[in-house]
């Protein structure tokens, strides 16, 4: 019944249409869409139903990237008489696009206007549409013309790269038929295709002529039967069945072509009136295809749609028991017409371009609109707003002064008669170059009162006077006078003066006013804190620049950086004006090359990096205009233009522009506008792309992905960004941010929603630095991740799908991270703000946060930033700094006091260096505390910083000076006054030079800031301290290594004598040290040991103090520059206190010299005769005597019974080996022996070389002493011993000495001039004794020692000498006690038995030294630093001699001349002497001539008894000075 009802309704509506007008049929429309077909043939009457004026026929290309559609139109003469056929192609099946295409009349082919019978067309886009158009005067319904059935269309889908054999055969058939019909005219048969080669005869294809005819009026659907017809070679599973199953029996209505007539299964219009005819055709079709083996057709299926034009399908099966194939199709479809019209919903058209700003200056508004296609047949209207507004800001408008409201009228000026009333108004201040208010500021009018009596009347008030002060409250006044008072009348009531306050604002203090400044070629005038100062922009820009004067935390006014947000460069301004002019003229054609050129120019400008903050806003405005122009012109930018666009965005978002963005966004939030521009541009690019096409854009700061996806093709979730993509930038490849877009977001809920809009443009953008330039949020909330954007057009309908977003944190230490998205509907200015609505935080840890969001937007992570601890300046340093600096200073001051008390004992270069070092540290600590309280005073802070810089460097340099001094001491370098001056230059001069250079170059800029009094951490000024300090540490390490190498390596000592002694240092008690504190008795082995000890102490001091010093000053710098951290202050206090304690321990408590000096101080070790004993010792050192040394000293003084002063001179006199002279005295008066006498202190020394006798029992005369003929072979290995003699033998010395003998190493004995008392003995005048009066004073007897001479040390354990014993002619000899040395051959030989018998009773003056013997081993090897004290300054390290020597014990009587004149004949007695090694040897020296026979007696003295010791010593060197 329902079908009958629909049929009756259809017939009735057709009847009404025929009866009441034909013209109404012109409003009917129909459309046909053919897809999934590779070949077809349709007649015009089949394609367009009769009497339908607005019909289209559309063919869809399966894949435009692979296939092309070839169209052939066979035209008859009368087929196009009543209408026109238009053919065109397009990519998107959109009514708006088609209307726009028809309106432009671009690329539309008029098929009926062709003069040829055949028209060939080729198309490569998604859709081909043929439209039948009737003229405007079309009369209405017409009969069907037979020519319409003869004119038909053929189309072919052909592979572009490898065409199939079937396709080429069809093309060649078209060409063959065209050539036949045109009688060989080839110009009208042009088919532009080169992949196919047509044979000369069609039979070569292997297809008969009958099959060629079957290609007309047939449709081949794309199914399993025809799948192989699209490929060049058939696969095993493919067939190309062109067949007789599509053949149809001849039918006159459809035209006869050969033996058969083939009819395509065409779609029909919903308004076609031939329903019965269709049913008849179907019946005939079923009958004529009912061959044996083929079952009957099934019933037609239900119509695919409930409204509008749909389709019906029926099928049949083939039963062929004999193995034959069935002919004809097995599936058939037809168009079903449903009378119910489908509702057409209202559709928004595209947004119109943004209008120009509503105002040319100031805050304006831009508007865009869109229109809605009205709904039909009950469709829904359009949803959403019709207009859209957004703010715009081009430039600041000049603000003119505006009058405020008038005040109320004042009281009448008089109380009687006519007076006046006044009122005034205020004018607001003009800004940005605006004009002042125009017009009067006051008005007056008359007022009428009763007539006055004879009393006085007030005149009008005068004007207010100027304010007495400009600030801090002043006063202004006005006056009036009283007139008209009669004699009997009354005076005016009231007062004639009125006063009021003015200028009540507080005057700024001098430190609250920013001084005049010159910056960036602009002069900034004095401005109170809180105000803005304005200036013109630089010459290359237009606009105004501003600079704010603000107060610091300490209440001091200071200039901020200038703001260039209103400055626009001339190049940017010119580019902006050129675009606005084109937009105003409406030149759409500029969208092509014009906009591309604009982006290239803007790219060049942004790559220069020298733009202002205002240029950023102009660049965003230019990009907005370019995007709007592309949208308006429907222009698709080229790939180069797209890349340039995103490169411009990357340049604008560079991290270097962070400060410029912060400055620019104080006027307008350009970063938010930039995000919106990028989204719009992405969709413009995406709409111009083909399906399944994607574009990946990668720059230094932006990664973007643009994809065009049909909804049905999205089978998996989409991930962004793609880490493994080729060419991915490093920061995006290493990024841990990602977003997962679910596939369900593209899939509609039901298949009924699939329409032409089911193709989506997906855009995703990852910004690297956008979080840095977004507007600052309140409540210490910051963007703590990269910003990622996901956008899809058209927007998908709301689903239950969630976007999975995972973002990595940028900063550690933030609190409460949470997910947000950008919501532009919550802001009053249409710019938007961050919102948590629609986004929830799923999982968060210390480095990542995972979110689930139900909408598309811009996503990020917000977190709470910990609040900074602001430490207010209290005007006093912290307690920690005070404690640390105080303890360090206390320790160093204690050290200085100790050194001052013991200075006479420990004065040396090392002590002077230490005092200077302590002074630099104490000064640094004091300046650190001062700098903490003077940050508000710039001049004092700058001065404090400069001195702090100086003393910090000085402390490092004095450590280096100590290392240098140790190195020179170890290597034995001579240190003169010039060298000591270099110590001062290194310790104080080098830091002063560095600081002066730094201050000169920087002009004190950076010396002190608003927060601390130290070198600024910006600009590299800190390297003025770090660089020299690091260099000092490096050099100190090198010197330390060299010193250590010298101390541990004997081969490292170049000096022969030092090297020899270095070999003896392995035995610490190898020698005996004799120190007579007042007579200058010292040991030669003491120098090397003491020098090494001091060097090791200095080396250990450098290794400990220098790292501690570096740690202390490093923590001091951190404590001064970062007051918020208490850790650095604690570290400084610990290191600084430890530094002072270590210095006191190393240089005071553990230093041996200080210990000895302190003991001596407690024992009052001072000369009782001369309190000032410092001049008696080398280099001002007070010799600290041990018990043994005191015994020697007491013995010496008990005999002398007088001042030891002369002995001191003799002590100095005895230093003859390479002493250090004054630097202001040059060596002069050098004798032929190479020894300078005039320069020695006292000028009393000369020497005589006395040859050693070969035999011990042979007497020695003065003639033998004066014999200069010395054998070279005997002198090469000899050693020397010096004895004080008189000056009258100086000539003899000169004759004896030879040049080669002067260079020999020598040992010395210095005899004092006044230390021995000599008296002649009247009883023994005939006896020849050596007396000090006959023996020349102040002379040195130089003895040559035979290297072969040896002594037996055990024999001399006990030996006493008697000066009263008479000497025999040859047996009794002058005996000398010798000490055995392994390094030196002893030079005395005699029969030990003759002298061993000497007893202590024979010599009354012999003193037993048993107490000294008991302590002999204790003081056998005491090392000391030998220094000399000259008449102008202290001498430096004294280089000792490297020779073994023995001390003369006493002199005896000299044998007579007769005994001495009997030498061995023909032989030198010295040459024949062969001493036995088992005896202790003595040498008898005949000093005087035979003519000098004065009998002298050499009395034993106390000091001689000190020396008369059986010294049992081992290998070692020592030198005794008396």
Swiss-Prot record:
Disulfide bonds join 303-336, 307-342, 318-326, 357-392, 361-397, 372-382, 412-447, 416-452, 427-437, 467-502, 471-507, 482-492, 514-549, 537-567, 819-851, 839-853. The keyword Endoplasmic reticulum does not apply. Keywords: Cell membrane, Disulfide bond, G-protein coupled receptor, Glycoprotein, Membrane, Phosphoprotein, Receptor, Repeat, Signal, Transducer, Transmembrane, Transmembrane helix. The modification Phosphoserine is found at residues 619, 1220, 1411. GO terms for biological process: cell surface receptor signaling pathway; maintenance of synapse structure; motor learning; myoblast fusion; negative regulation of angiogenesis; neuron remodeling; positive regulation of synapse assembly; regulation of dendrite morphogenesis. Gene3D superfamilies: 1.25.40.610, 2.60.220.50, GPCR, family 2, extracellular hormone receptor domain (4.10.1240.10), Rhodopsin 7-helix transmembrane proteins (1.20.1070.10), Thrombospondin type-1 (TSP1) repeat (2.20.100.10). The endogenous protein is proteolytically cleaved into 2 subunits, an extracellular subunit and a seven-transmembrane subunit. Residues 693-869 form the GAIN-B domain. Residues 1-25 form the signal peptide. Residues 902-910, 961-981, 1045-1098, 1147-1522 are cytoplasmic. Residues 819-869 are annotated as: GPS. One of its GO terms (molecular function) is GTPase activator activity. It is found in: Cell membrane. Brain-specific expression. CDD domains: 7tmB2_BAI3. Residues 291-343, 345-398, 400-453, 455-508 form the TSP type-1 domain. Its main location: membrane. Residues 26-880, 932-939, 1003-1023, 1120-1125 are extracellular. GO terms for cellular component: cerebellar climbing fiber to Purkinje cell synapse; plasma membrane; postsynapse; postsynaptic density membrane; synaptic cleft. Belongs to the G-protein coupled receptor 2 family. Adhesion G-protein coupled receptor (ADGR) subfamily. Forms a heterodimer, consisting of a large extracellular region non-covalently linked to a seven-transmembrane moiety. Interacts (via its TSRs) with C1QL1, C1QL2, C1QL3 and C1QL4. Interacts via (C-terminus) with ELMO1, ELMO2 and ELMO3. Receptor that plays a role in the regulation of synaptogenesis and dendritic spine formation at least partly via interaction with ELMO1 and RAC1 activity. Promotes myoblast fusion through ELMO/DOCK1. This is Adhesion G protein-coupled receptor B3. It comes from Mus musculus (Mouse). The gene is Adgrb3.
């Amino acid at each position: 019944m329902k079908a009958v009802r629909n049929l009756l309704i259809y017939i009735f509506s057709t009847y009404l249409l025929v009866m009441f007008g034909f013209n109404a049929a012109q409003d009917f429309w129909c459309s046909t869409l053919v897809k999934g077909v590779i070949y077809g043939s349709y007649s015009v009457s089949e394609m367009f139903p009769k009497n339908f004026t607005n019909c289209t026929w559309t063919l869809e290309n399966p894949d435009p990237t692979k296939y092309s559609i070839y169209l052939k139109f066979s035209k008859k003469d009368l087929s196009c008489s009543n209408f026109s056929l238009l053919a065109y192609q397009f990519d998107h099946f959109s009514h708006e696009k088609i209307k726009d295409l028809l309106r432009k009349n671009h690329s539309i082919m008029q098929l009926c206007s062709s003069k040829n019978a055949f028209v060939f067309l080729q198309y490569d886009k998604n859709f081909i549409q043929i439209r039948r158009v009737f003229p405007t005067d079309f009369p209405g319904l017409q009969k069907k013309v037979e020519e319409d059935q003869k004119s038909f269309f053929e189309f072919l889908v052909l592979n572009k790269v490898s065409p199939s054999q079937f396709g080429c055969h069809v093309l060649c058939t078209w060409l063959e038929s065209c050539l036949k019909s045109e009688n060989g005219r080839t110009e009208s048969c042009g088919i532009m295709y080169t992949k196919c080669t047509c044979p000369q005869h069609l039979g070569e294809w292997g297809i008969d002529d009958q099959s060629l005819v079957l290609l007309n009026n047939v449709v081949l659907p794309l199914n399993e039967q025809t799948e192989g017809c699209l490929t060049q070679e058939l696969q095993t599973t493919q067939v190309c069945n062109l067949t007789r199953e599509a053949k149809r029996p001849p039918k006159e209505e459809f035209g006869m072509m050969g033996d058969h007539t083939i009819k395509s299964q065409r779609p029909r219009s919903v308004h076609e009136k031939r329903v019965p005819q269709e049913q008849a055709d179907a019946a005939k079709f079923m009958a004529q295809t009912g061959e044996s083996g083929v079952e009957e057709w099934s019933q037609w299926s239900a119509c695919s749609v409930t409204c509008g034009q749909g389709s019906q399908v029926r099928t049949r099966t083939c039963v062929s028991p004999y193995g034959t194939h069935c002919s004809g199709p097995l599936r058939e479809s037809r168009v079903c017409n449903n009378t119910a019209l489908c509702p057409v919903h209202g559709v928004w058209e595209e947004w119109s371009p943004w209008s120009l700003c509503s105002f040319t200056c100031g805050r304006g508004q831009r508007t865009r609109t869109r229109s809605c296609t009205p709904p039909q047949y009950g469709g829904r209207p359009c949803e959403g707003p019709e207009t859209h507004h957004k703010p715009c800001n081009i430039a600041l408008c000049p603000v003119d002064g505006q009058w405020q409201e008038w005040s109320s009228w004042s009281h009448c000026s008089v109380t009687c008669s006519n007076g006046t009333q006044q009122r005034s108004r205020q004018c607001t201040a003009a800004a940005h170059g605006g004009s002042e208010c125009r017009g009067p500021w006051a008005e007056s009018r008359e007022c009428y009162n009763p007539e006055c009596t004879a009393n006085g009347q007030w005149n009008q008030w005068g004007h207010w006077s100027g304010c007495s002060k400009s600030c801090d409250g002043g006063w202004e006044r006005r006056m009036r006078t009283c007139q008209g008072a009669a004699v009997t009348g009354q005076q005016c009531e009231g007062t004639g003066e009125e006063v009021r306050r003015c200028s009540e604002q507080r005057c700024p203090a001098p430190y609250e006013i920013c001084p005049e400044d010159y910056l960036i070629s602009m002069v900034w005038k004095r401005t109170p804190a809180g105000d803005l100062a304005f200036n013109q922009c630089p010459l290359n820009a237009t606009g105004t620049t501003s600079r704010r004067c603000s107060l610091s935390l300490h209440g001091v006014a200071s200039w901020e950086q200038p703001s260039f947000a209103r400055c626009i460069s001339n190049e940017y301004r010119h580019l902006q004006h050129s675009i606005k002019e084109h937009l105003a003229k409406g030149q759409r054609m500029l969208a092509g090359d014009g906009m591309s050129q604009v982006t290239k120019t803007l790219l060049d400008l942004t790559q220069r990096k020298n733009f202002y903050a205002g240029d950023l806003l102009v660049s965003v405005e230019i990009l907005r205009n370019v995007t709007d122009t592309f949208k308006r012109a429907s222009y698709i930018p080229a790939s180069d233009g797209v890349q340039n666009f995103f490169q411009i965005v990357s340049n604008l978002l560079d991290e270097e522009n962070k400060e410029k963005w912060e400055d620019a966004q104080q006027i307008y939030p350009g970063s938010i506008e930039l995000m919106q521009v990028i989204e719009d541009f992405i969709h413009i690019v995406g709409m111009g792309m083909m399906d399944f096409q994607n574009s990946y854009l990668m720059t230094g700061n932006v990664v973007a992905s643009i994809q065009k996806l049909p909804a049905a093709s999205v089978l998996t979730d989409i991930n962004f960004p793609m880490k493994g993509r080729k060419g991915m930038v490093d920061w995006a490849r290493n990024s841990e941010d990602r977003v997962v877009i679910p596939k369900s977001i593209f899939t509609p809920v039901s298949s009924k929603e699939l329409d032409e809009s089911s193709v989506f443009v997906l855009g995703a953008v990852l910004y690297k630095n956008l979080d840095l330039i977004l507007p600052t949020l309140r409540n210490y909330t910051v963007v703590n991740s990269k910003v990622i954007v996901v956008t899809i057009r058209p927007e998908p309908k709301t689903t239950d799908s969630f976007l999975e977003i995972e973002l990595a944190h940028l900063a550690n230490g933030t609190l409460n991270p949470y997910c947000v998205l950008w919501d532009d509907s919550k802001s009053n200015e249409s710019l938007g703000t961050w919102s948590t609505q629609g986004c929830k935080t799923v999982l968060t840890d210390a480095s990542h946060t995972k979110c689930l969001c139900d909408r598309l937007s811009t996503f990020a992570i917000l977190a709470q930033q910990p609040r900074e601890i602001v430490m207010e300046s209290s005007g006093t340093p912290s307690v920690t700094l005070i404690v640390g600096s105080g303890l360090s200073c206390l320790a160093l001051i204690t050290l200085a006091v100790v050194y001052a008390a013991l200075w006479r004992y420990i004065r040396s270069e090392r002590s002077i260096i230490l005092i200077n070092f302590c002074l630099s540290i104490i000064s640094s600590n004091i300046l650190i505390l001062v700098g903490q309280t003077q940050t508000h005073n710039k001049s004092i802070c700058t001065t404090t910083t400069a001195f702090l810089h100086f003393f910090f460097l000085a402390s490092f340099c004095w450590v280096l000076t100590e290392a240098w001094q140790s190195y020179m001491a170890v290597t034995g370098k001579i240190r003169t006054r010039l060298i000591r001056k270099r110590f001062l230059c290194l310790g104080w001069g080098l830091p002063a030079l560095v600081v002066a250079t730094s201050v000169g170059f920087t002009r004190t800029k950076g010396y002190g800031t608003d927060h601390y009094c130290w070198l600024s951490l910006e600009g590299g000024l800190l390297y003025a301290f770090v660089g020299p300090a690091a260099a000092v540490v490096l050099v100190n390490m090198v010197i330390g290594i060299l010193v250590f190498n010298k101390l541990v390596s004997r081969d490292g000592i170049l000096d022969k004598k030092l090297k020899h002694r270095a070999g003896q240092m392995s035995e610490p008690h190898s020698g005996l040290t004799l120190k007579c504190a007042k007579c200058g008795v010292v040991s030669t082995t003491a120098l090397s040991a003491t020098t090494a000890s001091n060097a090791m102490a200095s080396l250990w001091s450098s290794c400990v103090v220098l790292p501690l010093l570096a740690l202390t000053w490093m923590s001091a710098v951190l404590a001064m520059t970062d007051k918020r951290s208490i850790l650095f202050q604690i570290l400084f206090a610990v290191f600084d206190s430890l530094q002072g304690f270590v210095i006191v321990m190393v240089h005071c408590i553990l230093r041996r010299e200080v210990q000895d000096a302190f003991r001596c101080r407690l024992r009052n070790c001072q000369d009782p005769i001369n309190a000032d004993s410092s001049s008696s010792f080398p280099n001002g050192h007070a010799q600290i005597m041990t018990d043994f040394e005191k015994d020697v000293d007491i013995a010496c003084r008990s005999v002398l019974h007088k001042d030891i002063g002369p002995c001191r001179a003799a002590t100095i006199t005895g230093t003859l080996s390479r002493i250090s002279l004054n630097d202001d005295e040059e060596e002069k008066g050098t004798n032929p022996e190479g020894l300078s006498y005039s320069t020695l202190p006292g000028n009393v020394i000369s020497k005589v070389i006395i040859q050693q006798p070969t035999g011990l029992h042979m007497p020695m005369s003065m003639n033998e002493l004066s014999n200069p003929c010395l054998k070279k072979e005997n002198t090469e290995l000899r050693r020397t011993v010096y004895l004080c003699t008189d000056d009258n033998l100086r000539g003899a010395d000169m004759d004896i000495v030879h040049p080669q003998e002067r260079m020999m190493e020598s040992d010395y004995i210095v005899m004092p001039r006044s230390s021995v008392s000599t008296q002649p003995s009247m009883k023994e005048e005939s006896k020849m004794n050596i007396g000090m009066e006959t023996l020349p004073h102040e002379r040195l007897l130089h003895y040559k020692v035979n290297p072969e001479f040896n002594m037996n040390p055990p024999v001399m354990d006990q030996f006493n000498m008697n000066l009263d014993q008479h000497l025999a002619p040859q047996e009794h000899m002058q005996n000398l006690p010798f000490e055995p040395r392994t390094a030196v051959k002893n030079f005395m030989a005699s029969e030990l038995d003759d002298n061993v018998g000497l007893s202590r009773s024979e010599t009354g003056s012999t003193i037993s030294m048993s107490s000294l013997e008991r302590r002999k081993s204790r003081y056998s090897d005491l090392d000391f630093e030998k220094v000399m004290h000259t008449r102008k300054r202290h001498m430096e390290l004294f280089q000792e001699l490297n020779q073994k020597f023995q001390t003369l014990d006493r002199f005896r009587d000299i044998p007579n001349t007769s005994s001495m004149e009997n030498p061995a004949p023909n032989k030198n007695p010295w040459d024949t002497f062969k001493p036995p090694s088992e005896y202790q040897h003595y040498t008898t020296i005949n000093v005087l001539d035979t003519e000098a026979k004065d009998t002298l007696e050499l009395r034993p003295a106390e000091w001689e008894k000190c020396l008369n010791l059986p010294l049992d010593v081992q290998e070692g060197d020592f030198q005794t000075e008396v």
